[in-house]
């Protein structure tokens, strides 16, 4: 059985929860051959892997969403070749732009015409007519030129992805909807294979939250972008044979966005709790500090600035508190610098940015961990903290509430939940956690029992073994438990 993982903007280029999950999944099934379709912004990412690839990951195909000679409204081109749509192609393209029910097979086939130029199509007469009709129907109160260029910007990366010759596999496993779901749906159309969608966060909601806060897009144009991401997710839900999510509320959101409930299966995350046993603790010198740890990527979605400001307030009451921010800071260097500058401007002491580290070297030395994200799914960092007997302070996003309070499991609270971006509330939680050692230990043990009861890697592996074998059986494929053997890793474009 050959499984093609389709991932956008994460594995194997960026360290994080989803990347770690993909790496763990592939390594959990040495009997399956995996290939990877990795979607990234541009060629600057080419081959820059931060993970050592498993032996059963045999090929990596890279898709660059900005891989074209295009500048907004100022493209240098020798000539414009007209791309003429058939009546059927025109109708389905119009349906897609108008967010109506669309025969996507026609769209997929269109972009696999030989020599079809995305640039020429977007600059051509047919796309102009489609944009004009959409404008006249729904957006005639705004400037048409701005609307037209917005549509071109929206569809450029999607159309570029649709030109990809997707490698053949028995199962396409997309680790999100969005562009991953588009490619997975197209692969199913051309190869007749099965399609599995696994959402960690709800892609549409995450993009919507980003767009609402974004300064580069304003007014009605935010809604136009949001509708585009909804459309892409709906396509993935419609074409998928199965859709998984991490917790019950995520299932509700998927259904709200149009996913048929009979397709959805809740599959919680799982970690190897044994690797986090017997971690090194504090040295005698380190015991003078109360250590608060944050395992994260230094990016805006993790809201590190709120964490730093909350720590500055908390440290006024707990003088021996120390904040350890553990994780890479190179994904958004501008934001990382703003965080460093914030620490300096606040004049706060004892904030350590470690960069990328082996969490096992640090986690045992923490008294509690901290997560101030504005969006999450089911954070692996919380599960890892629990496996190390550490309580957690987390914002009320994603599945954090259930991870901290449980779902009537009888284990009790494993930390403190706060509102997002609430500096005072987070600071108070840090003080409370720091001064109550007995409560810290009780919460840490509750988390340890919870993670071992519901979130172990062997449990997750068994669920996905059942899912993968089910797809294999339905396609009459051979299934063996023997490790897949390959001698050469080949990276292809």
Briefly describe each language-model feature range:
Residues 249, 270:
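Carbohydrate-associated surface elements
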Residues 280-313, 324-326:
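Conserved donor-binding/catalytic core segment of Leloir-type glycosyltransferases
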Residues 425, 432, 439-454, 460-470:
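A short, well-ordered alpha-helix in the C-terminal region of glycosyltransferases
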Residues 336-356:
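Nucleotide-activated donor-binding/catalytic signature segment of Leloir-type glycosyltransferases, i.e.
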Residues 391-394, 398-405:
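Short hydrophobic beta-strand element within catalytic cores of glycosyltransferases
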Residues 406-423, 432-437:
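Conserved acidic donor-binding segment of nucleotide-sugar-dependent glycosyltransferases
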Residues 374:
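Aromatic "clamp/platform" in nucleotide-sugar-dependent glycosyltransferases that forms part
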Residues 322-337:
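Glycosyltransferase donor-sugar binding loop
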């Amino acid at each position: 059985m050959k499984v093609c993982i389709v991932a956008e903007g994460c594995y194997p280029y960026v360290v994080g929860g989803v990347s770690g999950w993909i790496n763990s999944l592939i390594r959990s099934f040495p009997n399956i051959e995996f290939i990877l379709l990795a979607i990234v912004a541009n060629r600057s990412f080419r081959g820059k892997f931060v993970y050592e690839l498993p032996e059963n990951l045999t090929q990596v195909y890279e898709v660059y969403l900005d891989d074209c000679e295009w500048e907004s409204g100022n493209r240098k081109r020798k000539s414009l070749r007209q791309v003429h749509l058939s009546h059927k192609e025109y109708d389905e393209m119009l349906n897609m732009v108008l967010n109506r029910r669309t025969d996507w097979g026609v769209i997929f086939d269109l972009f696999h015409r030989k020599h079809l130029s995305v640039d020429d199509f977007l600059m051509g007469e047919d796309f102009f007519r489609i944009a004009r009709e959409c404008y006249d129907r729904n957006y005639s109160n705004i400037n048409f030129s701005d609307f037209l260029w917005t549509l071109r910007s929206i569809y450029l990366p999607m159309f570029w992805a649709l030109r990809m010759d997707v490698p053949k596999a028995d199962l396409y496993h997309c680790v999100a909807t969005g562009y991953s779901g588009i490619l997975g749906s197209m692969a199913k159309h051309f190869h007749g294979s099965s399609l599995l969608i696994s959402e960690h966060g709800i892609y549409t909601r995450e993009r919507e939250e980003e767009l609402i806060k974004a300064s580069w897009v304003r007014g009605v144009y935010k809604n136009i972008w949001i509708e585009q991401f909804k459309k892409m997710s709906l396509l993935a839900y419609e074409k998928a044979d199965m859709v998984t999510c991490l917790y019950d509320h995520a299932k509700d959101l998927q259904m709200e966005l149009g996913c048929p409930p009979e397709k959805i299966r809740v599959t919680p995350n799982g970690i190897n709790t044994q690797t986090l046993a017997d971690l090194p603790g504090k040295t005698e010198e380190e015991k003078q500090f109360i250590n608060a740890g944050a395992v994260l990527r230094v990016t805006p979605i993790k809201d590190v600035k709120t964490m730093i400001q909350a720590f500055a307030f908390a440290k006024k009451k707990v003088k021996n508190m120390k904040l350890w921010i553990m994780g890479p800071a190179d994904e958004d260097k501008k934001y990382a610098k703003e965080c460093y500058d914030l620490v300096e401007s606040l004049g706060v002491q004892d904030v350590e940015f470690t960069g990328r580290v082996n969490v096992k070297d640090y986690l045992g030395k923490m008294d509690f961990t901290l997560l101030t994200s504005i969006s999450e799914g089911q954070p692996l960092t919380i599960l890892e903290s629990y496996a190390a007997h550490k309580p957690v302070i987390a914002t009320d996003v994603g599945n954090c509430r259930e991870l901290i309070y449980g779902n009537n499991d009888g284990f009790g609270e494993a930390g403190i939940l706060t509102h997002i971006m609430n500096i005072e509330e987070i600071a108070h939680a840090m003080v409370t956690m720091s001064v109550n050692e007995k409560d810290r230990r009780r919460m840490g043990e509750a988390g340890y029992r919870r993670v071992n009861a519901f979130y172990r890697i062997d449990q997750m592996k068994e669920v996905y073994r059942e899912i993968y074998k089910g797809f294999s059986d339905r396609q009459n494929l051979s299934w063996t438990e023997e490790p897949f053997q390959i001698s050469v890793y080949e990276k292809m474009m």
